[in-house]
C-alpha cells in the first residue's frame, strides 16, 4: 500500500487557513433559513413597509459575494459577527413594539425622503458619496448614483451594499468586520477619544455623530438590545464595551 506524505509546509498552510477562516463554510452555515426566519420573524408583518423584500436567499447570495463575511476566525468569532451585523441592521430598519428587539427589517426606506440619497436597505445607506463608493465596491459602477432606488428594489443589491459597508474601512474608521473579529487595534487618536474594541465602536462607525459621546440614549440601547438577543440565539458572549456613550465620534478626530 502506498501512502502520500503531507509535508510540514503543507500542514502549516492548512493550519493557517483554518485559523483565518479561509476554509470555513459560508455565512449560510451559521444563518440557516430557519434561524433567519426566527431572528427576523416580524419583517413580513402586514404593518411592515418592507414586507416580502428581505429574503433569506437574497441575504445568502449577497453574503457569498464577500468571502470573509461570517467566515473569519473560530466558530464564536463567526457567530458574533453575524449577531453584530444583524444587531446593527435590525436597529436601522426596526418597526413594531419598542423594547422587544424582534422588529428588525420592517423598513427598507427612510421615512424622511427629502434627499435623493436618503437611507435605504439594511444599513440605511445615505449620502451620494456612499452610494458612489458602494456601487464601485459591489461592481455596479455608477448605477447606484444614477438610480439609488436599486438599493430599495433589488434585495440582493440591498444586502450587498450593507455587507460592503460592513466590510470596508473608510477614512479614519476601521471596518465593522475587523472590529468584531478582533483584528482592529486602536490608534493613539482612538485611545484618546475612548474608542475601544467592542460592539460600541461599531455603532460609532455607523452613526457616531448622532448617537455617541452623549451619554446613555435609546438608539444605542436599541442596537445593544438587538445584538444581545441575537448573541443569545447563537449562544455566544457579547463581549465588553457595548456602548459608545463616552466615545468621541470619528469626525472629531
UniProtKB/Swiss-Prot annotation:
One of the Pfam families matching this protein, by short name: Glyco_hydro_19
Keyword NAD set for record: no
Any one GO molecular function term: endochitinase activity
Broad EC category: hydrolase
GO biological process entries: cell wall macromolecule catabolic process; chitin catabolic process; defense response to fungus; polysaccharide catabolic process
Annotated active site: 92
SUPFAM superfamilies in UniProt: Lysozyme-like
Family assignment from sequence similarity: Belongs to the glycosyl hydrolase 19 family. Chitinase class II subfamily.
Cited function: Defense against chitin-containing fungal pathogens.
Name of protein: Acidic endochitinase pcht28
Amino acid at each position: 500500500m502506498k501512502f502520500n506524505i503531507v509535508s510540514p509546509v503543507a500542514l502549516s498552510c492548512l493550519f493557517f487557513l483554518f485559523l483565518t477562516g479561509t476554509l470555513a463554510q459560508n455565512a449560510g452555515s451559521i444563518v440557516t433559513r430557519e434561524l433567519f426566519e426566527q431572528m427576523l420573524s416580524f419583517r413580513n408583518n402586514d404593518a411592515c413597509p418592507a414586507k416580502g423584500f428581505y429574503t433569506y436567499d437574497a441575504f445568502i447570495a449577497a453574503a457569498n459575494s464577500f468571502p470573509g463575511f461570517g467566515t473569519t476566525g473560530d466558530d464564536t468569532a463567526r457567530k458574533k459577527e453575524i449577531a453584530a451585523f444583524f444587531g446593527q441592521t435590525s436597529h436601522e430598519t426596526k418597526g413594531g413594539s419598542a423594547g422587544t428587539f424582534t422588529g428588525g427589517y420592517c423598513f427598507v426606506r427612510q421615512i424622511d425622503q427629502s434627499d435623493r440619497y436618503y437611507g435605504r436597505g439594511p444599513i440605511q445607506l445615505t449620502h451620494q458619496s456612499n452610494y458612489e463608493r458602494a456601487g464601485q465596491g459591489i461592481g455596479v459602477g455608477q448605477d447606484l448614483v444614477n438610480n439609488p432606488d436599486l438599493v430599495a428594489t433589488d434585495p440582493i443589491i440591498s444586502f450587498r451594499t450593507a455587507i460592503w459597508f460592513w466590510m470596508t474601512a473608510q477614512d479614519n474608521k476601521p471596518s465593522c468586520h475587523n472590529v468584531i473579529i478582533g483584528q482592529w487595534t486602536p490608534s493613539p487618536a482612538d485611545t484618546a477619544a475612548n474608542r475601544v474594541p467592542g460592539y460600541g465602536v461599531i455603532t460609532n462607525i455607523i452613526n457616531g455623530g448622532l448617537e455617541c459621546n452623549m451619554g446613555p440614549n435609546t438608539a444605542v440601547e436599541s442596537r445593544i438590545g438587538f445584538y444581545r438577543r441575537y448573541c443569545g440565539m447563537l449562544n455566544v458572549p457579547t463581549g465588553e464595551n457595548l456602548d459608545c456613550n463616552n466615545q468621541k465620534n470619528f469626525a472629531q478626530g
